[in-house]
A protein has these predicted regions:
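Polybasic/polar functional segments that serve as interface/processing modules
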Residues: 1-114
Length: 114
């Protein structure tokens, strides 16, 4: 029997407003806000602003991590949400990211890790 220890959601969001995902401040505000709203336990974070635009960020949570990579020139966001413990928190975080980034379309994969 395989024991499931976490839920991992990998997502690609298409048609996201470049203004929303070009600058670190905007991306950080959205990601940190979702982590807080879902009730994940933030340990720390690192964000990198690319020139002329685009952001990579990772939030270390005691349950695992949330990472993001943005390509404003392609209106693209890649998300990685991995939580050990309550699998509903990963799903809630994903739904909030969809609400905040408002992609025209997306695809995602849900993996039960164990």
């Amino acid at each position: 029997m395989t024991m499931i220890v976490g839920r991992h959601i990998i997502a690609e969001l298409y048609g996201v407003s470049p203004e929303l995902i070009s600058r670190e401040e905007n991306v950080r505000c959205i990601v940190d806000g979702v982590v807080d709203e879902v009730g994940l336990n933030k340990v720390g974070s690192v964000y990198k602003q690319f020139n002329p635009h685009g952001v990579t960020g990772i939030v270390l949570i005691s349950e695992s991590h949330v990472s993001i990579h943005t390509w404003p020139e392609y209106e693209l966001v890649n998300l990685d949400i991995f939580t050990c413990g309550d699998p509903q928190k990963a799903e809630k975080a994903f739904k909030l990211f969809i609400e905040r980034f408002k992609p025209k379309s997306y695809r995602h994969y849900i993996l039960d890790r164990g």
